[in-house]
Curated annotation (Swiss-Prot):
Active site location: K171
Catalytic activity: D-sedoheptulose 7-phosphate = 2-epi-5-epi-valiolone + phosphate
Originating species: Streptomyces hygroscopicus subsp. jinggangensis (strain 5008)
Keywords: Antibiotic biosynthesis, Lyase, Metal-binding, NAD, Nucleotide-binding, Zinc
Lineage, opening ranks: Bacteria, Bacillati, Actinomycetota, Actinomycetes, Kitasatosporales
Protein name: 2-epi-5-epi-valiolone synthase
Length: 414
């Protein structure tokens, strides 16, 4: 077969024609270049700060923007946002979404699409603004990817999990038939603006929810980040990762930056997930099924933490983690008041959870297990017997005497 290359308007894209036994044929080869920015920008709604206005600018014409905002975020920041936009001559319309896990369905995506259509969002130069947690940015991202076959959007994550995970990658998604993120696309926002000041109004549980995903990054690739969580975890929650006199400002900013950097280092070379062996899938082998089975009792990060605890015990049983290392891992989880077990975590559910993950990973477990703290290996041979033994170990260690001796009678969130 001889191929003849034709001209192309796009670098890296080619059209070839060739002949087969039955006649003419063509092959299309195209590359999609993607670049986007993730910017830490404190005091985002300060009228003197032009960053948001610049992101929404239309050049010489007055900006007109659709803003999809979480209902809670609107109650907290709606007036401040409106004053900022008015001060920068941005005409806007709010689409308010009560963005919780139960609303993470296609019906909510269609609500956003309806708002986009009614507003008259053009195809290229008027990005929709998504302002809220990871659930909201996932919903808006999916709507933007579908509307006119892809329109741009800008993310302002207001939760920690949005700032270090859901709001900085390429994936969008909603749940379908009790399956986590079963429907989705790859459609990164052109810009993500991270203002740690929003965390000041985040409740402690949702802050811990984000710290669970930071712990994920720490355990598989960043031992220094783990040390920071171990040393400052409680105060990070107490002070909502805010700077201040006697506060954890320096540690908080370092934790945030290392978490974002670590996540992006893993995502960038494999943005479209052509490679299904992903370090950032640590904590995500069992957790999608656990989270959906326990809904609405568990937040995403809490389900991930249960998965990480189970995976860490599996690693310990295989000699990848020492007893001391496993103790440190579980102690940090308890320090952050994150769960390590839940009543839905039966052997049958975990068997089904792993089976579904194997389908998602194209027939392989590709399960990341920690090897020491700050490193990981992939395994493909975890057995049901190992899972049941790990569940038993977790149940036995649920409230270890050493923790009570160190910290007294405290609610450990398990």
């Amino acid at each position: 077969m001889t191929m003849t290359k034709q001209s192309s308007l796009s670098p890296g894209s080619r059209l070839y024609d060739y002949t087969t036994q039955d006649g003419a044929a063509w092959r299309v080869s195209a590359l999609k270049e993607v670049s986007y920015d993730v910017v830490v920008q404190p005091r985002l709604l300060d009228p003197a700060n032009p960053a948001l206005a610049d992101a929404l600018s239309s050049g010489t014409t007055p900006a007109r923007r659709l803003i999809v905002i979480d209902a809670t975020v609107r109650s907290l920041y709606g007036e401040q946002l409106a004053a900022y936009l008015a001060g920068h001559d941005v005409e806007f319309h709010l689409c308010v979404i009560d963005a919780h896990e139960s609303a993470k369905v296609m019906e909510t995506v269609f609500e956003v699409v309806d708002a986009m259509d009614a507003f008259g969002v053009p195809r290229r130069h008027a990005p929709v603004l998504a302002m809220g947690g990871g659930v909201l940015t996932d919903i808006v991202g999916l709507a933007a990817s579908l509307y006119r076959r892809a329109t741009p959007y800008v993310r302002i994550p207001t939760t920690l999990i949005g700032m270090i995970d859901a709001g900085i990658g390429a994936k969008t998604g909603v749940n379908f038939r009790e399956h986590k993120n079963r429907l989705g696309t790859y459609h990164p926002s052109s810009l993500t603006l991270i203002d740690p000041g929003f965390l000041a109004t985040l409740d402690a549980r949702h802050l811990r929810n984000g710290l669970a995903e930071i712990l994920k990054v720490a355990l598989v690739k960043d031992a220094e980040l783990f040390d920071l969580l171990e040393g400052h975890g409680a105060s990070l929650v107490e002070q909502r990762m805010q700077p201040g006199e006697g506060g954890t400002g320096g540690a908080a900013l370092t934790v945030l930056r290392r978490a974002v950097q670590g996540m992006l280092e893993e995502l960038q070379p494999n943005l479209w997930e052509h490679q299904l062996r992903r370090l950032v899938d640590f904590g995500h082998s069992f957790s999608p099924s656990v989270e959906m089975a326990a809904l609405p009792e568990l937040l995403h990060g809490e389900a991930v933490c249960i998965d990480m605890a189970l995976s860490s015990v599996l690693a310990h049983h295989r000699g990848l983690l020492t007893e001391a290392e496993l103790g440190r891992v579980l102690d940090v989880m308890r320090l952050l008041h994150l769960p390590v077990l839940h009543p839905v975590c039966t052997p049958d559910l975990m068997r089904a959870a792993l089976a579904d993950t194997v389908k998602h990973r194209d027939g392989w477990q590709h399960m990341p297990l920690p090897r020491g703290i700050g490193d990981a290996v992939f395994v493909n041979d975890v057995t049901q017997r190992e899972i049941e033994a790990a569940l038993l170990t977790l149940a036995e260690r649920d409230r270890v005497p050493r923790w009570r001796a160190l910290h007294g009678a405290v609610d450990m969130g398990v």
